[in-house]
Swiss-Prot record:
NCBIfam families cross-referenced by the UniProt entry: S6
Recorded family membership: Belongs to the bacterial ribosomal protein bS6 family.
Keyword match Ribosomal protein: yes
Protein name: Small ribosomal subunit protein bS6
The keyword Metal-binding is annotated on this UniProt entry: no
InterPro entries noted in UniProt: Ribosomal_bS6, Ribosomal_bS6_sf, Ribosomal_S6_plastid/chlpt, Transl_elong_EF1B/ribsomal_bS6
GO cellular component: cytosolic small ribosomal subunit
Length: 151
């Protein structure tokens, strides 16, 4: 049997419990066709880069699969039919990663960071400050509307 990583994007207007039920449904399809499901990671509701079927956000779920190709094909066929599934991607891998995926570790790193590694802004919120005299420029020309001519 081959090893696969499968990422599923579900609609934003269903609940997390419904997403978990979807994953359980597809786990049942895989197991009925002789496959096994390893790690299941829920990445939660995340913004999409662009709209997919009028959705701006989606529930992301990663599933590690050890199954024959026919079982994966049947799962993908059922996902195409389901309206709650926006997108999915199945990739064959040599071995599954141990521990958390890169998406979850990045989120944890972001939570631990205090923000002290960023430079402090000066008062007023602008970082350029006063630019001083621009001696390389001549005197300013009057604008057309300042000279009395209308546009």
């Amino acid at each position: 049997m081959a090893l696969y990583e499968h990422v599923l994007l579900a609609r934003q207007d269903i609940s997390q419990q419904q997403v978990d039920a979807l994953v359980e449904q597809y786990k049942g399809v895989l197991e009925a066709n002789g496959g096994k499901v390893g790690k299941v990671e829920s990445w939660g509701l995340r913004p999409l880069t662009y709209r997919i079927k009028k959705n701006r956000k989606a529930y992301y779920t990663l599933v590690n699969i050890d199954a024959p190709a026919a079982a994966v094909a049947e799962m993908e066929r059922q996902m195409r039919i389901n309206e709650d599934v926006l997108r999915f991607l199945t990739v064959r891998v040599e071995e599954h990663e141990e521990g958390q995926s890169a998406m979850l570790t990045r989120r944890d790193d972001r939570r631990e960071r205090d923000g002290d590694d960023r430079p402090r802004r000066r008062e007023g919120g602008f970082d350029r400050g006063d630019r001083g005299d621009r001696g390389d420029r001549g005197p300013r020309r009057p604008r057309d509307n300042e000279a009395g001519e209308g546009a």
